[in-house]
Structure formats: structure tokens, C-alpha cells
Amino acid sequence: MTFISNLADTRLAWGLLFLSALVLVAYALFSQHAMGLQPCIMCIYQRTAIFGIMFACVPVLAANNMLTRLFAFTVWGISAIWGGLIAWEHYDIQNAANPFFATCEIVPNFPSWLPLHEWLPNLFAATGDCGNIDWVFMDMSMPQWMMVVFAIYSSIWFVVLASRLIGNRAI
């Protein structure tokens, strides 16, 4: 348990977390721009959650102290859990009994002060349909894989955070 608790003190662990999220974003962009898969709103929200995990790592990589770790754990946990819920909702849309009632928005619902889809359309513009299953790997669609990814991120977050709290360590 001490080993797990000590992971949050190392930049290597935070760097690996950042790198894992970067690989997922790189594959998403490859799927979009090289394979021609069009991301839907739910895909964009999941991509935003992955960017949230990447963003959470940056302060700790710059200066690993209690304040940056508190920020990182908070943003990481919110992003991982929110991403998992979005992936679950996306899966439900794709497998709805009546697809006419399972729809998603046309334009991303980003805050007016942060219109990512307008500022960075190559990353955050949604052009696909949430109900389409255009990609399958090992009998699982993209939302199913993202549920697995976010479950792993959430589980690691919980285990590391719990081990620090149980071991009476500062965040």
C-alpha cells in the first residue's frame, strides 16, 4: 500500500498518466483525420474528459507539492468519472431500442466563455452521429472501449487517493 501511496509523489507516475491520455488523444485524432471517422458530440465530450486528465497532470509535473496534487486529484477524478458517465450515455444511445428517441445535441454545449468547438474546431467540432457505430475492435464499439478506459482511470484515481488518505499522507 505504501508503494501505491508514494506514486503521487513521483513525477514519473504523473508523466505516465499524462502520456496515456496523450496517446488516447493522438489515436482519436488519427481516427478522425486519417481514418475518416467523424466524432459526435459524445465523442467530443469524452475527448474533453481525456484533455481534463492531461490538464490535471501539468501542474504536478511543473511543481509537485500538496497544492498541485490536490488540484490534480480533483480534476483527474472529475474528468475520469464524468468521462465514464458520458461514455455510458453514448453506449446507451447506440444501443437504444428506439433510435428515434435516443439523440444527442448538434452543437457542443461548452460554456460561452470557453467555446472550444469554435476556437479549436479540428479538436472539438462534432460532425458525426452519436447513434452510428462506425468502429469496432474485439467486438466492442468506441464508447464501450472508452467506458473501460475511464473505469481504469477512475479505479487508479480511487486506489491512489484512498491509499494516501488511509495512510494518513497529505494529498
UniProtKB/Swiss-Prot annotation:
GO MF annotation: an example: electron transfer activity
Family: Belongs to the DsbB family.
Gene for this chain: dsbB
Location in the cell: Cell inner membrane
GO cellular component term, pick one: plasma membrane
Residues in compartment: Cytoplasmic: 1-13, 64-70, 164-171
Species whose genome carries this gene: Pseudoalteromonas atlantica (strain T6c / ATCC BAA-1087)
Record's bilayer topology term: Multi-pass membrane protein
HAMAP family, alphabetized: DsbB
Membrane-spanning parts: 14-30, 49-63, 71-88, 145-163
Disulfide-linked positions: C40-C43, C104-C130
Name the record gives this protein: Disulfide bond formation protein B
Principal localisation: membrane
Primary role: Required for disulfide bond formation in some periplasmic proteins. Acts by oxidizing the DsbA protein.
Pfam families xrefs: DsbB
BP terms from Gene Ontology: protein folding
